[in-house]
Amino acid sequence: MRKIIINGGKALSGEVAVSGAKNSVVALIPAIILADDIVILDGVPAISDVDSLIEIMELMGATVNYHGDTLEIDPRGVQDIPMPYGKINSLRASYYFYGSLLGRFGQAVVGLPGGCDLGPRPIDLHLKAFEAMGVEVSYEGENMNLSTNGQKIHGAHIYMDTVSVGATINTMVAATKAQGKTVIENAAREPEIIDVATLLNNMGAHIRGAGTDIITIQGVQKLHGTRHQVIPDRIEAGTYIALAAAIGKGIKITNVLYEHLESFIAKLEEMGVRMTVEEDAIFVEKQESLKAITIKTSPYPGFATDLQQPLTPLLLKADGRGTIIDTIYEKRINHVPELMRMGADISVIGGQIVYQGPSRLTGAQVKATDLRAGAALVTAGLMAEGKTEITNIEFILRGYASIIAKLTALGADIQLIED
């Protein structure tokens, strides 16, 4: 069993570069199946989710070369075969294969997706959109069968009942090679959606409105190869900004797009965090006094649900009482009992997280229950006095590229141990 050992209480300094966006690349890789030639992605993060996606692509017949942060995929050999259940079940973003396989073959046999357990994340919105485009859905054991019964998937006017990044991207990808026009209303607006649309348009798609709540896709017959730069990971950037404010004595975070983090930065400024925003970087100063605030997550451009857990350790340094309300994922509270083990004055009351600061954290044995909870525990371990041991670290490695090396370069006493 692998674990992370941290000897905390040491102020960090230096510079850390943000990697490419996990939430983009997990959708970009499956979308490449639609291309008729080689596609190259630059800025691909070295995370285990990427390794899993590469393995799935190779099992399906794609030729893949991955060197440094450059990923080259030739999808011409991809075959219409049932997808490997084991890998699919471990990867929530595997549902992005639905849209790309439907767009290319008009059918798909896939296992139901896995990933972090954050409460209900139904794929009903995806399936409702596919059905509007002529797809029939059936189930056999642990597999889901999607088929157009030999017909070409067709365009449709689709209204998303709730704002969903995954359903918006999946529908957009499927519609790219559909017959006719597709309109998605109440679409999600996240930067990762724009990134996927940019890749597809560079491959020859006709997509307008990505980043707004109405996206229009005019189907095309062929998509060609291209080269694409993955956007920076705004969640990784936010994690390091919060970490820098919590335990830093001057840290510069580079490869940052400020416009993707405006709501997050605004809440930090409300706390009293001192920082300087540069063209593609943010310098976080050593902090003095901070005040407690209330966080309420909402769809982009609101406060990202993926950032409420990584921010929590910093909130524990603030003076006063505050609350965290996650309106997106109701079970995103699993980091709370782990932080309590470390001495945090924090609890869950009526589905809301309530904290009283400042809390003095001490090292403890804790368990990462999901990706962003794991990030919170790493920051808490760096803040705490003494030794912190984090288990279940596979969640952390799913989404944070080279996290041990990056933190070590800032001066952290942190190790990944193989038991």
Curated annotation (Swiss-Prot):
Gene Ontology CC terms: cytoplasm
Cell cycle keyword on record: yes
Pathway: Cell wall biogenesis; peptidoglycan biosynthesis
EC number: 2.5.1.7
Positions annotated to bind phosphoenolpyruvate: K22, N23
Modified residue annotations for 2-(S-cysteinyl)pyruvic acid O-phosphothioketal: C116
Residue numbers binding UDP-N-acetyl-alpha-D-glucosamine: R92, R121, P122, I123, D124, L125, D306, I328
Pfam families per the UniProt record, alphabetical: EPSP_synthase (PF00275)
Catalytic activity: phosphoenolpyruvate + UDP-N-acetyl-alpha-D-glucosamine = UDP-N-acetyl-3-O-(1-carboxyvinyl)-alpha-D-glucosamine + phosphate
Catalytic site positions: C116 (proton donor)
Listed GO biological process terms: cell division; cell wall organization; peptidoglycan biosynthetic process; regulation of cell shape; UDP-N-acetylgalactosamine biosynthetic process
Compartments reported by the entry: Cytoplasm
Family designation: Belongs to the EPSP synthase family. MurA subfamily.
Function in brief: Cell wall formation. Adds enolpyruvyl to UDP-N-acetylglucosamine.
NCBIfam families for the chain: murA, PRK09369.1, PRK12830.1
Protein name: UDP-N-acetylglucosamine 1-carboxyvinyltransferase 2
Organism in which the protein naturally occurs: Streptococcus pyogenes serotype M18 (strain MGAS8232)
Gene encoding the protein: murA2
